[in-house]
Amino acid sequence: MSTVLRLAIQKSGRLSEESIKLIKECGIEFSSGGGTLKSVAYNFPLEVLFLRDDDIPGYVADGVADIGIVGENVAVETRKKMDTVRQLGFSKCRLSIGVPKAMEFTGKESLNGMRIATSYPNILSDYLFENNIKASIHEISGSVEIAPGIGLADAICDIVSSGSTLISNGLKETEVVFRSEAILAACPQLSAEKKAILDELMFRISAVKNAEKTKYIMLNVPDHAIQTVTALLPGVKSPTVMPLAEKGWSSLHSVVKESDFWEILSKLKEAGAEGILVLPIEKIVK
């Protein structure tokens, strides 16, 4: 029987959707609908397990799953022994302290003596210790935001994305305790065969991630301006330059970061560039 790498991902929610999208962008085809709990890829040695996010670190650490995509906050909180292969850049959030809006809060020192409700006692405990704060931790498994309103705690420490949940419960965000995003984690005891499959998967993931927020740009430029334009468009190594049928003109092809595009565009126009086309990129293999 051929070796198969077993991947654990969250069975529902935003992290699940992003994880499935990433794997499928790597050219790996598998079934992911209809309440599926296990799916074998059709064209890659990969089996996907759909689990509760809190269970993923344990499955990976115990070797039931070889690798897992999980929130960094969950991985750190569970204290399970896993190797972090790479951060994935999605499902970003933060674990923050929230206090009642009316409370006067002057800084971390204001937390001294407080009762703080949280579902992340380990991460919060580390934060309090590192900042020499003396506060008590009240662990609860859900609906953390309600704790100050019912007298269960003075403050909370919980996951924040937009902050709207805090506001709707009469709280304000004060201190960021931990910043998190999705990570790919692996069992430390992978066999050589499974490491080889993981290396191939990582090669594909890197190609997909390298292309994110990057655009392919094509433009026409007078030959006398090629050096100026080339300096603006470094590309992966350097821009591709091809002469056009019209004498004195060339076509340049390059890669630019989307965040830099508008600033570069103005400079390209100033240098005499015309017919600028911008296209999305699916993969970049370096």
Curated annotation (Swiss-Prot):
Localisation: Cytoplasm
* Major enzyme class: transferase
Please summarize the record's notes on activators and inhibitors of this protein. Answer: Feedback inhibited by histidine.
The main location is cytoplasm
User: What does the record give as EC number?
Assistant: 2.4.2.17
Catalyses: 1-(5-phospho-beta-D-ribosyl)-ATP + diphosphate = 5-phospho-alpha-D-ribose 1-diphosphate + ATP
Recorded GO cellular component terms are: cytoplasm
Q: Which cofactors does it use?
A: Mg(2+)
UniProt xrefs under SUPFAM superfamilies:
GlnB-like, Periplasmic binding protein-like II
State whether keyword Zinc applies: no
Which pathway is recorded for this entry?
Amino-acid biosynthesis; L-histidine biosynthesis; L-histidine from 5-phospho-alpha-D-ribose 1-diphosphate: step 1/9
Q: Spell out the molecular function terms from Gene Ontology.
A: ATP binding; ATP phosphoribosyltransferase activity; magnesium ion binding
Query: Any idea which UniProt keywords this protein has?
Result: Amino-acid biosynthesis, ATP-binding, Cytoplasm, Glycosyltransferase, Histidine biosynthesis, Magnesium, Metal-binding, Nucleotide-binding, Transferase
List the Pfam families hit by this protein, alphabetically. HisG, HisG_C
Q: Which GO terms describe its biological process?
A: L-histidine biosynthetic process
The protein's matches in InterPro entries, at most eight in alphabetical order, are given as: ATP-PRT_HisG_long, ATP_PRibTrfase_cat, ATP_PRibTrfase_CS, ATP_PRibTrfase_HisG, HisG_C, N-reg_PII-like_a/b, N-reg_PII/ATP_PRibTrfase_C
Q: What does this protein do?
A: Catalyzes the condensation of ATP and 5-phosphoribose 1-diphosphate to form N'-(5'-phosphoribosyl)-ATP (PR-ATP). Has a crucial role in the pathway because the rate of histidine biosynthesis seems to be controlled primarily by regulation of HisG enzymatic activity.
**Family per similarity comment:** Belongs to the ATP phosphoribosyltransferase family. Long subfamily.
Q: What is this protein called?
A: ATP phosphoribosyltransferase
Organism name: Cytophaga hutchinsonii (strain ATCC 33406 / DSM 1761 / CIP 103989 / NBRC 15051 / NCIMB 9469 / D465)
Classification of source organism: Bacteria, Pseudomonadati, Bacteroidota, Cytophagia, Cytophagales
